[in-house]
From Swiss-Prot:
<dbReference type="GO" id="GO:1904562">
    <property type="term" value="P:phosphatidylinositol 5-phosphate metabolic process"/>
</dbReference>
<feature type="binding site">
    <location>
        <position position="415"/>
    </location>
    <ligand>
        <name>a 1,2-diacyl-sn-glycero-3-phospho-(1D-myo-inositol-3,5-bisphosphate)</name>
    </ligand>
</feature>
<dbReference type="GO" id="GO:0008138">
    <property type="term" value="F:protein tyrosine/serine/threonine phosphatase activity"/>
</dbReference>
<feature type="modified residue" description="Phosphoserine">
    <location>
        <position position="643"/>
    </location>
</feature>
<feature type="region of interest" description="Disordered">
    <location>
        <begin position="852"/>
        <end position="871"/>
    </location>
</feature>
<feature type="binding site">
    <location>
        <position position="413"/>
    </location>
    <ligand>
        <name>a 1,2-diacyl-sn-glycero-3-phospho-(1D-myo-inositol-3-phosphate)</name>
    </ligand>
</feature>
<keyword id="KW-0472">Membrane</keyword>
<feature type="compositionally biased region" description="Pro residues">
    <location>
        <begin position="589"/>
        <end position="599"/>
    </location>
</feature>
<keyword id="KW-0378">Hydrolase</keyword>
<feature type="region of interest" description="Disordered">
    <location>
        <begin position="932"/>
        <end position="971"/>
    </location>
</feature>
<dbReference type="GO" id="GO:0060090">
    <property type="term" value="F:molecular adaptor activity"/>
</dbReference>
<dbReference type="GO" id="GO:0042149">
    <property type="term" value="P:cellular response to glucose starvation"/>
</dbReference>
<feature type="modified residue" description="Phosphothreonine">
    <location>
        <position position="725"/>
    </location>
</feature>
<dbReference type="GO" id="GO:0004438">
    <property type="term" value="F:phosphatidylinositol-3-phosphate phosphatase activity"/>
</dbReference>
<dbReference type="InterPro" id="IPR017455">
    <property type="entry name" value="Znf_FYVE-rel"/>
</dbReference>
<dbReference type="GO" id="GO:0005829">
    <property type="term" value="C:cytosol"/>
</dbReference>
<feature type="binding site">
    <location>
        <position position="411"/>
    </location>
    <ligand>
        <name>a 1,2-diacyl-sn-glycero-3-phospho-(1D-myo-inositol-3-phosphate)</name>
    </ligand>
</feature>
Amino acid sequence: MRHSLECIQANQIFPRKQLIREDENLQVPFLELHGESTEYVGRAEDAIIALSNYRLHIKFKESLVNVPLQLIESVECRDIFQLHLTCKDCKVIRCQFPTFEQCQDWLKRLNNAIRPPGKIEDLFSFAYHAWCMEVYASEKEQHGDLCRPGEHVTSRFKNEVERMGFDMNNAWRISNINEKYKLCGSYPQELIVPAWITDKELESVAGFRSWKRIPAVIYRHQSNGAVIARCGQPEVSWWGWRNADDEHLVQSVAKACASDSQSSVGKVSTRNSCRGFPNAGDLSDVEFDASLSNASGTESLALQPQKLLILDARSYAAAVANRAKGGGCECPEYYPNCEVVFMGMANIHSIRRSFQSLRLLCTQMPDPGNWLSALESTKWLHHLSVLLKSALLVVHAVDRDQRPVLVHCSDGWDRTPQIVALAKLLLDPYYRTVEGFQVLVEMEWLDFGHKFADRCGHGENSDDLNERCPVFLQWLDCVHQLQRQFPCSFEFNEAFLVKLVQHTYSCLFGTFLCNNAKERGEKQTQERTCSVWSLLRAGNKAFKNLLYSSQSEAVLYPVCHVRNLMLWSAVYLPCPSPSTPTDDSCAPYPAPGTSPDEPPLSRLPKTRSFDNLTTTCDNMVPLASRRSSDPSLNEKWQEHGRSLELSSFAGSGEEVPAIDSLRRPSRLLGGAELSVAAGVAEGQMENILQEATKEESGVEEPTHREHTEVPEVKEEAPLAKESRTAAQGSGVLYQEPQLDDATLRSHLGPSLSSFSQGIPEHREVGHSVLSSSLPASLRGEDSQEVPVEQPQVENIAEDRENVVPAVPVDVKIGLGTSESSPLLPSQVPFETRGPHMNNSVHMLLEDKVKSESGPQLHHRPCLASSGRFSGKDMLPIAPEPRSAERPQWDSVLHRTSSPGNTLSLMMQAPCALPLDKCRQRIVCNGALETENKASEQPAGFDTLQKYPTPNGHCANGETGRSKDSLSHQLSATSYSSAHSCSRNLHHKWLNSHSGRPSTTNSPEQPSRSHLDDDGMPVYTDTIQQRLRQIESGHQQEVETLKKQVQELKSRLESQYLTSSLRFNGDFGDEVTSIPDSESNLDQNCLSRCSTEIFSEASWEQVDKQDTEMTRWLPDHLAAHCYACDSAFWLASRKHHCRNCGNVFCSSCCNQKVPVPSQQLFEPSRVCKSCYSSLHPTSSSIDLELDKPIAATSN
């Protein structure tokens, strides 16, 4: 009851503070998280600075700084007007102010904000969780489990004991002596010890070990039974104390290992027994009986176990010096059959000084002359090398020598977890998975009491700077070194580790609060805060390493020399990331067969929006290099799955919609969607798609007949070249540059059938084009069931030289002045567009076909139908809708040439509706889905819709896929994004559910696109982005082949039905009824919506929906949104559509409309698709248009 009260009264427990603006015109330059409230907004010198209860945000002209308050270690004023902020992750931030008084004001504010909390509830993680729960409390479902880690974390101890195969009958047992932490407050409640060691002996051992941290087993090698144990140092002191129970326990660990390995059936052969236990001889199972549960039974064993390795992380001098403080080390004389090794690792004070030296070095000038020598003098890489060598020594002992190992340092909570966690990571592939790594951190760092609060400085009144040390960061750096040496052995990527570094200090999540599990239990952090694993979950593709192979090395043996280690630049080195979106750029990959140093001819180089494209091209300025602040290449792929629609084309007097300053994906000619992120040249995407196609598809290499003309194009004069570029652009602008040939060919099928029926003299040609565009394996060349006739491709190709000059050359497209203007498709190099980019040829050829095919339509084709060009009408007459109002991929005109140089003319059945009746989505069964009107969107969505989600859908919930059966589906398959965790999803959810108005538009808003769900900068990895592109290309090829197979099957069925109708004399009636249906203005007319006019399944499906009530999909079966495919988690809730019964996220199911078919006559929640079909058609007047770009002539 108390917890529910906390959720309801979150705004009273954690109230928002009053916003203080230094300038009334200033706005908060970021989207706030749940429970976050901005307290101050002001102006620095050439920057906007904002301070909330979670972060400090400084937006400069060319970059921005976004850092959680708890990540800031100190703030000081330098040079009177400059604030100097030192961060705990090695970053240093400098901010200049115009006046001394203003600098002092912000110095006081920041010092008050970063001060260690007086009570733990002052940390932001508690307010964040409470406000999250308050938002969720308004819903009927329970969402508390989404803040929690997975079952693999909560049940980690039991699962690990079973997974590692401990013999709990004879060798080991689980002791509950530390239940409720009554023995040791920094140890877990359950401990694995030898089976014959009693709890009384453990209590005696606890009195002899530092902080009562007794030897406890934490890992077992599944093959040979050798274990790793950890503990604190023995309290020998100057008096040389000893403890018989402690000596017995240490020796019993080695004996239990031998017992465990021998008692496993077939675990150790005679040969392996002799190798593992050289003094044991041939041992039989008779020597092991069930009486091992008491000490007397073990004494009777005639077993000689392996020699136990005691690894002391300290140097021998430090261990002896600790005897003056009551500590010490094991004396070999008192511990027979044990070997003591000292590793000489530095203590926390030396590590802290080394890290401070590294931080000072990394904040110097970008290219110091003595960089390498200065880096060596910090000894940071040297400390990493020693740590790796220590872990590798444990791996050698356990894996190769089959010896048990006992690890300790002084207290056992700093260097000890570093060594044992790194050793387990090297030994066991499970810990190199996302789930296994979470378990590893929970068990070795959290359960065994690493003092995160003291080491990170966010504990209650933790003002002692001598207790602070980046111990966990140092260990993560070692994991990063392993990732570099073994790139295929880790399921998670570098972004995963970077996020973990940030949230070790950020206090957004409660995972790393307090010093041990006992304190976390007392503060109820698990119930009152969110877990960091809810963000770094296994299903989040943003943190997945695409190079990972589960069949990689079982045990890793890294090279530990300093010369083989590298500085972790993503964490330590300052970088301009994330900068403002206008700085985004990415150097294109060189085209196959070209030198990367020489730009290809006739190729417009990548430039900034303020550059002169023509001048830059003529001067051959080198291509801009990619900066870390530039947008992800994956964003191109994220937009690949979005809906695509073609507008009707008429006169050239209309203006072209522009790209606004907030970088929304704009719509250019013909409804083609172009990403406004000026980061990737279209030619680069073509190269990527072509490479993926060549690698994955079995299609033969295309003939290069049409490319023989390319040298002539390259030889043209500059004026002719410019004219050619403009001419090509006029016919290409409506085409999405990301689409490759395979994707466009996937839309062959019913559309061509419908078109060919209207043109009898070209019916055979169109049918053969389809067949020739399919792979040989799908055409079934050995089969004679579908006889086709190859078209005369040569004649069509020969006409190209005569057709291209006919395109008007005076048509130019103005780029406007927006900083975020992308490269237009007309600037794509001629030779890199691929066969399907030369649409001016296809356009004119279609006109030629039209002129030969009989009478023309009297009505203008609608947006969803085939948009045709005339010889004089090159620009669209109608402006395009906003990105938030894009229709699906249904009923799209595709023009392409197949890889075999076969020209494919693909046309949808034309729509006879007037233009104002055609702004609708067409689904396969004939239902028309209208566009959402801007006036019907909830408050706050005007801003949110400007940020596309990784799945290619806008934040307001516009879906980009249709989930109908494949045989009746025209829309292209939407592929899952590499970033399933949508950016700023927390913030969108807050604005859409809590009713809090979003911040107004301001020049500061573009910086939001660089902030992730957690309010932190987005980390991008170009290698992983390239791998995601290849993976998407592969998936695209697979889906294309599946679609082609299905469409071929549907075509065969249609052909069979056609022949049957001809035989019965009914075919003529079907054909003659087509013009009537095209002229029919009824929205339920099916013949213009479905390309399978003879399909009976679609009619059966409609009848079934009319007669049956919709059954809801159970909650537990839905892990992803049915529309945008985003995973359900902390910031994405489940909602049922009352019409179709599927489960959607809140953005995709936020409309309400009566559903009479389900007996719901009051407005009920429905998805976007159902809302469009149930709501009256929106007029084109309601569609808000983007800022137009004037079409000017140069």
